[in-house]
């Protein structure tokens, strides 16, 4: 999938799992071409009964469709995120309608963090850090550097998103964060 097809231009989502906490953070900027349409969008949220958090990059309507589908899968599989994510990825890859949705997601529960793509990928990040979106590589690099010096997952996420916002013109500094206590 090319960056143009999935609409990466316009957001940064970062997940950090550290010292018994998992955080997913996202900036608030929504861009259309080279125009900022909204500076304070909420691209990070709790799913289902609140035991799963997620963030998205890509087309907003597509992401909400995928969040709804994931919530249904979570309910069907008794809150088992990995199983629900694999089932969603199968549907996303094979369903004629879902296959055309243009979004990426990072989701996490108290045990696992996953990156979900429209290619059918369900990826567990190495080191408990994952990022997607136009500023994702900047945030990922900053977070990986910060884990050697900072213990708190939320502080790492905020600082890493600040770095991404300083570099990526499609990322701003209006950050939304969701946090869960982690077993890992």
From Swiss-Prot:
Role noted for this protein: Protease subunit of a proteasome-like degradation complex believed to be a general protein degrading machinery.
Gene name, please? hslV
Tell me what reaction this enzyme catalyses.
ATP-dependent cleavage of peptide bonds with broad specificity
**What residues does Na(+) bind to?**
165, 168, 171
Q: Which domain of life is it from?
A: Bacteria
Q: How does it assemble?
A: A double ring-shaped homohexamer of HslV is capped on each side by a ring-shaped HslU homohexamer. The assembly of the HslU/HslV complex is dependent on binding of ATP.
InterPro entries per UniProt? ATP-dep_Prtase_HsIV_su (IPR022281), Ntn_hydrolases_N (IPR029055), Proteasome_sua/b (IPR001353), Proteasome_suB-type (IPR023333)
Looking up NCBIfam families in the UniProt record yields: ATP_dep_HslV (TIGR03692), PRK05456.1 (NF003964)
Descriptive protein name:
ATP-dependent protease subunit HslV
Q: What is the lineage of its organism?
A: Bacteria, Pseudomonadati, Pseudomonadota, Alphaproteobacteria, Sphingomonadales
Q: What is its main location?
A: cytoplasm
Ordered alphabetically, the record's keywords are: Allosteric enzyme, Cytoplasm, Hydrolase, Metal-binding, Protease, Sodium, Threonine protease
Which one of the record's GO molecular function terms can you name?
threonine-type endopeptidase activity
Q: How is its activity regulated?
A: Allosterically activated by HslU binding.
The record places the active site at 11
**Alphabetical list of Pfam families matching this protein:** Proteasome
Query: Where found in the cell?
Result: Cytoplasm
Q: Which GO terms describe its biological process?
A: proteolysis involved in protein catabolic process
């Amino acid at each position: 999938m090319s960056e143009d097809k999935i609409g990466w231009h316009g957001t940064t989502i970062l997940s950090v799992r550290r010292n018994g906490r998992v955080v997913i953070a996202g900036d608030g900027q929504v861009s259309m071409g080279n125009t900022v349409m909204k500076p304070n969008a909420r691209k990070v949220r709790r799913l289902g009964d609140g035991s799963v958090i997620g963030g998205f990059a890509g087309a907003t309507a597509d992401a909400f469709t995928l969040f709804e589908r994931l919530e249904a899968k979570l309910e069907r599989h008794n809150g088992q995120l990995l199983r629900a994510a694999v089932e969603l990825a199968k549907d996303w890859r094979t369903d004629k309608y879902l296959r055309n949705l243009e979004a990426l997601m990072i989701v996490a529960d108290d045990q696992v963090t996953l990156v979900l793509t429209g290619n059918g990928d369900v990826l567990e990040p190495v080191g408990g850090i994952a990022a997607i979106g136009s500023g994702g590589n900047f945030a990922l690099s900053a977070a990986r550097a910060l884990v050697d010096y900072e213990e708190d997952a939320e502080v790492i996420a905020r600082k890493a998103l600040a770095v991404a916002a300083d570099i990526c013109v499609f990322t701003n500094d209006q950050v939304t964060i969701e946090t869960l206590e982690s077993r890992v």
